[in-house]
UniProtKB/Swiss-Prot annotation:
It is found in: Cell inner membrane. It comes from the Bacteria. This is Na(+)/H(+) antiporter NhaA. It comes from Shewanella sp. (strain MR-4). The gene is nhaA. The chain crosses the membrane at residues 17-37, 59-79, 95-115, 124-144, 154-174, 177-197, 213-233, 261-281, 287-307, 328-348, 363-383. Signal peptide: none annotated. Pfam families: Na_H_antiport_1. GO terms for biological process: regulation of pH. Na(+)/H(+) antiporter that extrudes sodium in exchange for external protons. Keywords: Antiport, Cell inner membrane, Cell membrane, Ion transport, Membrane, Sodium, Sodium transport, Transmembrane, Transmembrane helix, Transport. GO terms for molecular function: sodium:proton antiporter activity. Gene3D superfamilies: Na+/H+ antiporter like domain. Belongs to the NhaA Na(+)/H(+) (TC 2.A.33) antiporter family.
Length: 389
């Protein structure tokens, strides 16, 4: 039994399976007699007081602001590694996934705005279908095992990382609220300290952790979303020490299982519970869920393929060795798996609006992501060579 559990946890697909279980459990509880317990649990006030510092938020916001900051720390570490040493470290390697990611963000956002034209409240959700859930997309691809060429995995990983970088910029520019000058000054001082540690060649993670915590609290209080603190911390942690070791990769490897098996499933459970009982057919086909679902299911693959094809034809990029358009197309469909990232943006976009909009956004995300996952999986399975061929 223990061996079976260890084998499951070692598989790349395990994270995607756990996310599905978390989503299913959240939907079950939100649409059962346990709905009150589910909502009450997420609404539980949690207070942390240290001297004059007093933080009190519902559990849901601790998950979205705290746990997701750790997830974005991991994303930041991955982005930095790929930019300096990995699949994005040269123009030739980065060109195709960069153009693909840009198209995969612009076209879904355009489709969403097309359906929500003229409504300033719902237009705030334009970035929801622009996101890709890197963990879930790679998990779905991993279900096909060794049939998937390494170059195709690298393409999806690079594309998703650039997509994440785009999401980080979007959050910073478009989803920050009224700013606190004092908190921003404290955050700036913490950033200067983190940069100084990096420049001095400090490789111990503890000093980065202390200043990082100060930065997170300051950013949380500043009006800029707290998850951005995780990215800043990641960019300041050294990739290589003088002895050749990598503090950044060590932390990345330590965070990966926590992210896969705790942070993302907990986030999905906390945010995916949509009560369907009070929704009519007209509500289900309203502009918000339709715009998100079509943005993910159609906009993502169209944008990725259109911009990739144009970049190759204009000789701005080239296809990976041994990979053709028939393999790129189903991967483009998989990019429509928005899940946790899209839900996260939805929580920011409609934070001040009627809760109904958040429910509609999550519903659209679930529908679009599940359809994108199914289409991408079966399409890729069809075009890849059979096992042993």
């Amino acid at each position: 039994m223990e061996k079976a559990i260890r084998n499951f946890l070692s598989q790349e697909s395990a994270g995607g399976i756990l996310l599905l279980v978390a989503v299913a459990l959240a939907m079950l509880m939100a649409n059962s007699p346990l709905a009150g317990l589910y909502q009450g649990f997420l609404g539980t006030e949690v207070q942390v007081r240290v001297g004059a510092l007093d933080l009190h938020k519902p559990l849901l916001l601790w998950i979205n602001d705290g746990l997701m900051a750790l997830f974005f720390l991991l994303i930041g570490l991955e982005v930095k590694r790929e930019l300096l040493e990995g699949a994005l470290s040269s123009v030739a390697q980065a060109s195709l996934p960069t153009f693909a990611a840009i198209g995969g963000m612009l076209v879904p956002a355009g489709i969403y705005l097309l359906f929500n034209y003229g409504d300033p409240v719902t237009q705030a959700g334009w970035a929801i279908p622009a996101a890709t859930d890197i963990a879930f997309a790679l998990g779905i691809m991993a279900l096909l095992g060794s049939r998937v060429p390494v170059a195709l995995k690298v393409f999806l990983l690079a594309l998703a990382i650039i997509d994440d970088l785009g999401v980080i910029v979007i959050i910073a520019l478009f989803y920050s609220t009224d700013l606190s000058t004092i908190s921003l000054i404290i955050a700036s001082i913490a950033i200067v300290g983190l940069v100084a540690l990096n420049r001095k060649g400090v490789t111990a993670l503890a000093p980065y952790g202390v200043l990082g915590l100060v930065l997170w609290v300051a950013v949380l209080k500043s009006g800029v979303h707290a998850t951005l603190a995780g990215v800043i911390i990641a960019f300041c942690i050294p990739l290589r020490a003088k002895d050749g070791s990598s503090p950044s990769e060590h932390l990345e490897h330590s965070l990966h299982p926590w992210s896969t098996f705790l942070i993302l499933p907990v986030f999905a459970f906390a945010n995916a519970g949509v009560a369907l009982g009070n929704m009519s057919l007209n509500t289900l086909i309203s502009p918000v869920p339709v715009g998100i679902a079509l943005g993910l299911m159609l906009g993502k693959p169209i944008g990725v393929m259109l911009f990739s094809y144009a970049a190759v034809k204009l000789r701005l990029a080239q296809l990976p060795n041994g990979i053709g358009w028939k393999q790129i197309a189903p991967v483009a469909a998989m990019c429509g798996i928005g899940f946790t990232m899209s839900m996260f943006i939805a929580s920011l976009a409609f934070e001040q609006a009627d809760p109904m909009y958040g429910d509609l956004a999550r519903l659209g995300t679930l529908i679009g992501s599940i359809l994108a996952a199914l289409i991408g999986y079966f399409w890729l399975s069809k075009v890849l060579p059979k096992q042993g061929v």
